[in-house]
Amino acid sequence: MEKLKNQECYDKNGNMLGWFSRSVAVAVFIFRKKEDKLQVLLEKRGKGAADNIGKYCSVCGYLDFNETLTDAAARESFEETGIKINTDKLKFLKINSDPSENRQNVTVHYVYFADETEDFNLSKAKGGEKDEVETVGWFNIATFKTEKELSVDIPKMYEMDFAFNHDKLIIEHLSKFFKLTY
């Protein structure tokens, strides 16, 4: 692998060896209502993660061969947090393909509203990369003023160091479902 021309890879004799393309990834923003609070499920990236070690993010990962996007969302959720999500409850949000924001991936974003009874159990998490996730937890990020209006606790969110702009994406995605006040 001596030389790259655009996404093509050539050896030193000019023979094309293959090409590089962007990967498809999923991001799953998991929320639940607990009493009068809205919580988000976040993971802290462990020492086995490819990048952004020690930073918080929502569930995210790559699409495997022979897998649908919703299958990838369910698999990544279980691998990284132990939560089994019902793919019928996944809500598609957007596709981020802007190379200036994310050169490596085309990311499909989903939101999932868990029931209070749905929980995670990291000890049940299977697969994934070794030590990819250090910890997983539910974090209070807003208080319900009404069923469709949230008072967002921005200072609490910004005490944490986020990977992949997930702090901004959490707010962006919530604004599609709730009126947000600060």
Task: Locate predicted features.
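Acidic, metal-coordinating catalytic segment for phosphate/diphosphate chemistry
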Residues: M1-D36
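Short Gly/Pro-enriched turn/cap motifs at secondary-structure boundaries
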Residues: M16-F20, E101, G128
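Short, solvent-exposed loop/turn segments that connect beta-strands within catalytic domains
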Residues: K33-Q39, A50-N52, T87, N102-Q104
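Conserved Nudix-box catalytic region and its N-terminal flanking loop in Nudix hydrolases
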Residues: K37-E79
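Nudix hydrolase/Nudix homology domain
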Residues: I53-G54, G127-Y182
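A short coil-to-beta-strand element that immediately follows conserved catalytic motifs
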Residues: K84-K94
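Active-site-adjacent beta-strand/loop module that shapes the phosphate/pyrophosphate-binding cleft
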Residues: I95-K124, G137, A142-T143
